[in-house]
Amino acid sequence: KWHSRFTEKEIRYLPQHPFIPGWLRLERALGDFRLQREDLERWFPEFISLRGTRIGELSGGEQRILECFIILRSPARFILLDEPFSQIAPLHVATLQTLIRQEKATKGILLTDHMYRHVTGIADRLYVMADGQAYPCENDEDLVRRGYLNHL
């Protein structure tokens, strides 16, 4: 199958780049991951009007939402999300944050994103990567001290 490297039950990974082939239709992509279109449409009602659409016809933001949804709603015990908020409209960022909050109750989630403000409200713990090491981050001042931000 086209998605076999993403179907492990223990861990799933959302890469930075699109991973669903453009020739697939929305329903096929969801079905291959044993997810229901209606579940996606409850979270993101805009997808109701996109029924039958090929993945390659979706906007970059729509495709990113779909990929995030597929990975987050999978039965995996641990999820890796690389830049999940990239190309996502502010309205959908809030919905995606709510989905992440819900899913983290039953699985471990490791999230990396440059848009740190999207992460601070949903993370249990924050770390800054600098000089090949991970440093705990307690507040915005830690982000400045570690060189992630120039100033507040």
Which sequence ranges carry the predicted segments?
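Walker B catalytic motif
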Residues: 83-84
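Hydrophobic anchor residue at the start of the ABC signature
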Residues: 67-68
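Conserved beta-strand-loop-alpha-helix hinge in the C-terminal portion
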Residues: 133-152
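Q-loop/switch helix immediately C-terminal to the Walker
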Residues: 17, 22-37
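ABC ATPase NBD coupling module
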Residues: 1-12, 17, 147
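Conserved ABC ATPase signature
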Residues: 54-58
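H-loop/switch region of ABC-family ATPase nucleotide-binding domains
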Residues: 112-114
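ABC ATPase C-loop
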Residues: 71-72
